[in-house]
């Protein structure tokens, strides 16, 4: 609702035909989470767009500039004279110039969308591009300096509110996980076997990572709770982790992509979060497969087409019509706060195991 108010107000202020709030995911793909437009225009709300539509170099430029204006997507770019800076002997740096022309490929992309002018407001969090407010007009449209500065200010203020809301949600969840972690440490300290402390009480190991299954593989025994792969599959998985993972934490929401044998137990473990207690001992959390239907703005597998006119070259796709993809072999993604909680638990387990070993010595 808040994001919808944002795009409505930006459209009221700027007069553009379409205004979208576009959010990036961890893979660089983006989705339209709010939209305000002319009734006659095709809706993009809820559609996903592949990373190749706004590739890494373009995202880097957006992260360096709060505002990007293209008043006429059909204009002829003007050559910079001289092309090489006579002092630095390098091409003139235009990253922060409002007059910097867009790449020919981007102009073609806008033409294919029926866009005559665009204004883009960057939403930047921790010096990284979180998303964009994208304004499109069907005909050329100039935006004055005063209005551009107003949009820049609006973008900063709006994203400050978005970031604050996200942090409030994260804080509540962090506090919940901190309580679970504290309880687990207390339970482990009270039990003769730390494994009992992780699974025999409430809250238990599952609550630390919002998992549907978990396993504590210690020595030659795997103790499980919830929905997990069978013992034989667990043993092979632990062996694979020993041979292939050196990090303090390993996590994936598509285990079958890196460990093909996981496809046979995808219904319980398409997602894996794993922490090593030692070279041979692991704590594992599992999430089941969640089959999703993703709505794309055009086929993401054909983001670029080959054009043989004037030589062979890549050009943007011409269709942005709804293209549905069914995504399988994936779970809900692990949140960073859950991964950090698992790492904190790892430290606590190591300390308790060492202390218990000293007491037995």
Regions found by a protein language model. Name each.
Residues 22-84, 217-243, 247-257:
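GAF sensory/regulatory domain recognition
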Residues 1-28, 116, 126:
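A conserved hydrophobic secondary-structure block that centers on an alpha-helix together
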Residues 27-28, 124-129, 138, 275-281, ...:
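Flexible loop/coil segments at beta-strand boundaries within sensory signal-transduction domains
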Residues 76-115, 254-272, 291-306:
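Signal-transducing coupling segments at domain and membrane junctions
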Residues 2-8, 163-229, 326-361:
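Signal-transducing coiled-coil/dimerization helices and immediately adjacent hinge/linker segments
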Residues 152-159, 343-347:
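Allosteric cytosolic regulatory segments
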Residues 116-124, 270-276:
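Short hydrophobic beta-strand micro-motif common in sensory/regulatory domains
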Residues 97-101, 136-152, 165, 284-286, ...:
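Regulatory loop-to-helix N-cap segments in sensory/regulatory domains
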